[in-house]
């Protein structure tokens, strides 16, 4: 009888110890899963933050456009607009077109073409300006800006069509100089308009007058 009692006590102790071990293992497994989940969540958040940063556009490519109202086109690279409630003259940044209205100067070849084309462009849609990092006005008080119609660069169009040359390049107002030079080279290679006459375009401007 005594042996039977001892055996029963031993069985009960074995069952109790087994149950405790099982609970301890389950707790460890649960803790392990919790730690793993936190680790995965942290990694996921870091990935998302990196992905968002990587997807943020570079500030250089961002345009801060200002809406203006056209008053009139003056020539190929100059217009008058209503800006901040007042009339202002805008001189196009980084380009030069043949003269048509410069005092004491003749009308130059393709000057009228550039003037006409510019007038068509600025009258064709929503007019906006973009300023660069440097001075917003030249020594004559004119606004210096990149000009857009319905989001498209007027300067680029004039350059691509051979009606303007890249000029007056002064840091830091050079945001689009690389693109403008590519546009100019494209027209030059195709010998469009101002590039169709050898020696007409120089580093100082244009040679010759309309006879």
Swiss-Prot record:
Source taxon at top rank: Bacteria
Covalently lipidated residues, kind N-palmitoyl cysteine: 20
Gene3D superfamilies, A to Z: 2.40.50.90
Protein name: Endonuclease YncB
InterPro entries: SNase_OB-fold_sf (IPR035437), Staphylococal_nuclease_OB-fold (IPR016071), Thermonucl_AS (IPR002071)
Region (Disordered), start-end ranges: 24-63
Database matches in SUPFAM superfamilies: Staphylococcal nuclease
Main location: membrane
General function of this protein: Shows DNase activity on double strand DNA.
Organism: Bacillus subtilis (strain 168)
Lipidation (S-diacylglycerol cysteine): 20
Residues of the active site: 91, 99, 142
The keyword ATP-binding belongs to this UniProt entry's keyword annotation: no
Family designation: Belongs to the thermonuclease family.
Required cofactor(s): Ca(2+)
Enzyme class: hydrolase
Catalytic activity, EC: 3.1.-.-
Loss of function: phenotype: Non-essential, it can be disrupted. Cells lacking this gene show DNase activity when exposed to thermal stress, as well as increased competence.
Domain TNase-like: start-end pairs: 64-197
Record text on activity regulation: Inhibited by aurintricalboxylic acid but not by Zn(2+).
Keyword Signal annotated: yes
Mode of membrane association: Lipid-anchor
Sequence ranges of Polar residues compositional bias: 31-53
Pfam family, one: SNase
Binding site for Ca(2+): 77, 96-97
Listed GO MF terms: endonuclease activity; metal ion binding; nucleic acid binding
């Amino acid at each position: 009888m005594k042996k039977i009692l001892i055996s029963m006590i031993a069985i009960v102790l074995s069952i109790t110890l087994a149950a405790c071990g099982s609970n301890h293992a389950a707790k460890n497994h649960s803790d392990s899963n919790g730690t793993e989940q936190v680790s995965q969540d942290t990694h996921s958040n870091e990935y998302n933050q990196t992905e968002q940063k990587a997807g943020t556009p570079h500030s250089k490519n961002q345009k801060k456009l200002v809406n203006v109202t056209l008053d009139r086109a003056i020539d190929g690279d100059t217009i008058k607009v209503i800006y901040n409630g007042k009339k202002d003259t805008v001189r196009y940044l980084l380009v030069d077109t043949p003269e048509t209205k410069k005092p004491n100067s003749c009308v130059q070849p393709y000057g009228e073409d550039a003037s006409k084309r510019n007038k068509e462009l600025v009258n064709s849609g929503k007019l906006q300006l973009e300023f660069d990092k440097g001075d917003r006005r030249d020594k004559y008080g004119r606004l210096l800006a990149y000009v857009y119609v319905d989001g498209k660069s007027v300067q680029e169009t004039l350059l691509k069509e051979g009606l303007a040359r890249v000029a007056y390049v002064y840091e830091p107002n050079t945001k689009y100089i690389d693109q403008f030079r590519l546009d100019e080279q494209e027209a030059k290679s195709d010998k469009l308009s101002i590039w169709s006459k050898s020696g007409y375009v120089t580093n100082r401007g244009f040679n010759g007058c309309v006879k």
